[in-house]
Each structure stands twice: as C-alpha cells, then as structure tokens.
A protein has these predicted regions:
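Beta-strand-loop-alpha "switch" segments that mediate conformational coupling across diverse proteins
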Residues: 179-229
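NTP-binding/hydrolysis catalytic cores, primarily Walker-type P-loop NTPases
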Residues: 226-263
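P-loop/Walker-type NTP enzyme "switch/lid" segment
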Residues: 14-20, 34-114
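Gly/Ala-rich phosphate-binding loop of Rossmann-like dinucleotide-binding domains
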Residues: 30, 34-35, 131
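Conserved C-terminal guanine-recognition region of P-loop GTPase G domains, centered on the G4
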Residues: 151-167
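Extreme N-terminal, non-catalytic leader segments
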Residues: 1-15
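Inter-motif core of Ras-like GTPase G domains
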Residues: 125-145
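Hydrophobic positions on the alpha1 helix immediately C-terminal to the Walker A/P-loop
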Residues: 24-25, 29
Length: 263
C-alpha cells in the first residue's frame, strides 16, 4: 500500500506479558529508523506507570545536563544526522489518538510513522479500542507456552476485529520472537512458529537474541557504546548477533517505510 504523505502509519507495540522486551525493542526501532534511516516519526508513550520512552528520555536528558563533556559529544554526534531528537508524546490509551491529532495540528507536515508503546497488558477495553486504530501491531513473544497462548489469543482477537469491525484501521499483526537463547533448544519456537502460520498469524522471519547489550544506556556506554538511547541509535559495534539490523530491514519492508529523500 502506498502511503500518503499526510497519512502517517500507526504502529503499536503490544504484549500480553510484562518483561518480554516490548518497550526496549520499540526504543531501538525508533532510534534506528529516525536517526539512521531518515524516517520522520514521533512516539506516543501510553505505557501506564512504566512510561519507558518518557523515562528513558528523562534519564538521557538528566545525564547530559550533569555532564557538559558528554553533552558536547552528543551534540556533535546529533549534528551529523542534521536533526533534533524525535518527539515523545506522553499519553494514556484512552486519549492517545486525540493527543496525536493535537500534535499534528502543530506540525507543517505529519511524520511518516507514529510508534505507540502500549501498556504491558493489552486485554482491556481501552487497549482493544486503541489496538484497532493501529495500522500495524508488533507483539514480542518468548518461548514460554503459557504466555504464548495468551499472545496468540490477543493476535487472533485483533485480526478478527480488524476484519469484522468497519471502523478498524488494522492491516496486519506481527509476532516477533524475542530474547532467544542461542544455546537452547528451538523446539518450542519451531512448534509455535508453525502453529502461528497454520492460524494465519504473521510472524517475523528475524529472531531477536538475548543479550545484555540491550540494557546499555548512555550512562553505561557513553556516546560510542550505547544501545538504548532516545538521542542516538545503538552503536554499530554492539549490534552483531542480536538480529536487530535484520529485523529493522524487515519492518521497513513490511510497513513500506521509505527514507525521506525517496518519499
């Protein structure tokens, strides 16, 4: 589907279980797409009490303000990208879309992509209402049969609502294997991947592998060794063997995202 310039893609990150890395993946994706791939975007943090995006930006900002040297180094790095940091809208599920509309009215041109970080448990009436306003939803899953059952149920519900509800925007729902242990058996993963395909539930080909690198913020890695940061993409040296770059390419392909100079 060809995207209209003033009709942004709404991408939601949702999960049925806390701790699956939903927000970390959304943060990494946003930074790579915005700073490296030159895709205009904004983030809506409606993750309840967690507010992962908002609090990450706060930690980044506080650290920069307390360290002039780090602030100077970060400013020099940002100048290479030729842009300011992406905007984060602090919101709640029931007013997330209206808050986005207010943001649009302040903009000359709407961004290409809006990323919504959902609360950790999506089966509430407010979350179901928000889910069907998305164009796409990405739901990270882990190799745990109990949590997989609830994740699959949510995916089926959204798929069926998207088909049967006239006001739905939903185009596709993607499951994503996350925190995969390279040394562990893939029996559960292979079994549930096949089960997802049989149920008609799309699943990314890419798998994201478990790594302590995902926890490296600006305070631990500095500008040259950071992985999670709202002002910078993950350091290139930290990405091999994580699956992140392969996944970002797959996201761009599935969502038909274009770099700004090719839009």
């Amino acid at each position: 589907m060809e995207k209209k310039k003033n009709n942004p893609i709404y991408l939601g990150f949702a999960s049925q279980k806390g701790g699956v890395g939903k927000s970390s993946l959304a943060e990494v994706l946003a930074s790579i797409l915005y700073y490296e791939k030159n895709i205009s975007l904004a983030v809506v943090d409606c993750d309840g009490t967690q507010e992962s995006f908002y609090k990450l930006r706060e930690r980044d900002r506080d650290l920069i303000e307390s360290s002039p040297e780090l602030g100077k180094e970060l400013h020099e790095r940002l100048s290479r990208y030729g842009k300011k940091s992406y905007h984060i809208i602090r919101s709640k599920p029931e007013r997330a879309v209206s808050d986005v509309m207010k943001y649009f009215r302040k903009m000359k041109t709407a961004p290409q992509l809006i990323i919504f970080d959902f609360p950790g448990h999506a089966l509430t009436s407010a979350m179901m209402d928000l889910s069907i306003t998305m164009d796409y939803i990405i739901s990270p899953i882990e190799a745990d049969p109990q949590s997989l059952a609830s994740s699959f149920a949510y995916a089926r519900t959204i798929r069926d609502l998207g088909i049967g509800f006239e006001g739905s925007r939903i185009q596709d729902f993607f499951l994503l294997w996350n925190k995969i242990n390279r040394s562990a058996s893939t029996t559960v993963i292979d079994l549930f991947s096949q089960n997802a395909r049989e149920q008609g539930l799309p699943i990314f080909d890419t798998r994201i592998y478990n790594s302590v690198r995902f926890s490296r913020e600006l305070a631990q890695g500095g500008v040259k060794g950071v992985f999670r940061c709202s002002y910078l993409p993950p350091a290139m040296a930290l990405r091999p063997q994580t699956g992140v770059d392969e996944w970002v390419r797959e996201v761009m392909e599935k969502l038909n995202l274009k770099t700004e100079d090719s839009v």
